[in-house]
Amino acid sequence: MTQIIDIEAFRADLSGTALTRGDHGYDEARSAWNGQIDRYPAVIARCRSAADVAAAIAFARQRGLEISVRGGFHNTAGTAICDHGLMIDLSPLHHVEVDPATRRARVGGGATLGELDAATQMHGLAVPAGIISHTGVGGLTLGGGIGWLLPLYGLTVDNLVSAEVVTADGRRLRASADEHPDLFWALRGGGGNFGVVTEFEFRLHPVGPVVHLGLFFWGLDQGTEVLKLGRDLFATLPAHTNAMITSVNAPPAPFVPERFHFMPGYILAIVGFGSAEEHTRVLAPIREALPPLFEFMTPMPYVALQQMFDEGAPWGVSCYEKSLLLDELSDEAIAVITDHQPRKTSPLSMMEVYRFGGAYAEVGEDETAFGGSRSTRFGVFIVGLTDDPESLAAARVWVRSFWEALHQHATDAGSYVNAMADIEEDRVRAAYGPAKYERLARIKAEYDPDNVFHHNANIKPALQPI
């Protein structure tokens, strides 16, 4: 009876709603993008304001409940959802307010990339972000934010101007270069360790609304040639162009000849943010150097580009992934990739090679808390995906074996915290390196000394704060 009275009193304190097991909407609210995640919070607080978030934190702390925070539910490890604790659900806070005159956007902590892109593109503007539209802005930003605009404008965190944060003791703070600069530094890469961000303010850039896409596809037997071609191409692309290498099964899309449907192979995707003429000049040498099995070139809206990979990573798919960073895509690393890629156990599984550099490399190593080195030239993501949950175990073995072999050629022991399916303390420490981790731990001790926010890629508070 006490729990029922507590819940009803808590509900009365919220402008949003509080759900418990059995309530209408509870199961939908606890669902995650990764279908492997199946957890049951004792309470789900669907917060409509920073005051709601503060009330939820106080309610949980008074009752000794573990706290997790949901932005978009897209984290592979499912850290947004806790068992038997209180989940702060920010999805009602999904506003996007754009000021085209100042090129700024204020974005709720529960907004998705699709909502952000749609609002900013109405003004021909964009924030560098990820490549799956149903990803949450919050989690993506706090871990870094890698996407198509990275070489043009950097990471998502490189474009964060300020953040409205509710801390573990219920304070509502604005973090920026001028206010709580230590907290602002930590939020730009340190994940959800320091508080609940209810609103982000981003710097916007002119993008689109039309961009230019080029796709080339080759079979698995040409993997070595494709990866070497991509390596050379990445180094010579013009400033307003980006590219990615992906190893996937060809989709049954209209632009794919039927005989190649579901065929495993390699895609080289080139996106031009400049003129059509410049894009044509970039593509011509590719087909001459290594004629593809098929190709596809088209202008397309930027928002469509941002949704291009949604179908390959649908909501509810079972996922396990690992990532690493490479200074060089050496011949030895290429040999590892071409050896392991044909061994994948699910047709949905994939490997992605991102191009770093450009604006990303122009940011100082210590300007943000982002874990990756700014000298890194390549990011490799090995993603096990399956629509059959029982077959994920085999995909997990493939991912781990692939990662272990490729890790011998990595920049260091680090990886991208947003792509950690296994949240382990040594991996988190390695992602940031000793100096950044120690600095983050001191800031953690200042703003969350009791480690209230630990259901994440956790940074433990230092014994002594700043």
Where are these regions (language model features)?
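Soluble FAD-dependent oxygen oxidases
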Residues: 1-466
